[in-house]
Amino acid sequence: MPITKDEIIKALEEMKLNELNELVKAIEDHFGVVASVGVAAAAPAEATNAAPTEVSVVMTSVGQQKVAVIKVVKELTGVGLMDAKKMVDGAMPVTIKEHVKPEEAEEMKAKLVEAGASIDLK
């Protein structure tokens, strides 16, 4: 019996960020394609006034407590320690998590700010 879309989505939801990155690279190599973000059409004027339903948590600077920030990034993203360190040590700004509900994003921001990072929600 073939795998259903729902089973694939469920499996993807359980994967860690680094595993998803490896999967995307494997798909690109196997099918000879490049994963790129498409440009969306302009939203109607009335929709732009509504509060966003999803936001991205973006770190703009690490601050003095780099180790504390790495621990929080690891906790929030579910990635391994080395991947969290790479995110924190990399070029800023860096997106910590995308497509997050605004309430969850505020909680993430509070934890990261408490650890010493500067965060923007976009």
From Swiss-Prot:
Gene designation: rplL
Organism, scientific name: Mycoplasma capricolum subsp. capricolum (strain California kid / ATCC 27343 / NCTC 10154)
Protein name: Large ribosomal subunit protein bL12
Keyword Ribonucleoprotein: yes
Keyword annotations from UniProtKB, A to Z: Ribonucleoprotein, Ribosomal protein
Region forming the signal peptide: none
GO CC field: cytosolic large ribosomal subunit
Ribonucleoprotein listed as a keyword: yes
SUPFAM superfamilies for this protein: ClpS-like, Ribosomal protein L7/12, oligomerisation (N-terminal) domain
Gene3D superfamilies: 3.30.1390.10, Single helix bin
Entries under InterPro entries matching the protein: Ribosomal_bL12, Ribosomal_bL12_C, Ribosomal_bL12_C/ClpS-like, Ribosomal_bL12_oligo, Ribosomal_bL12_oligo_N_sf
Coiled-coil residue windows: none
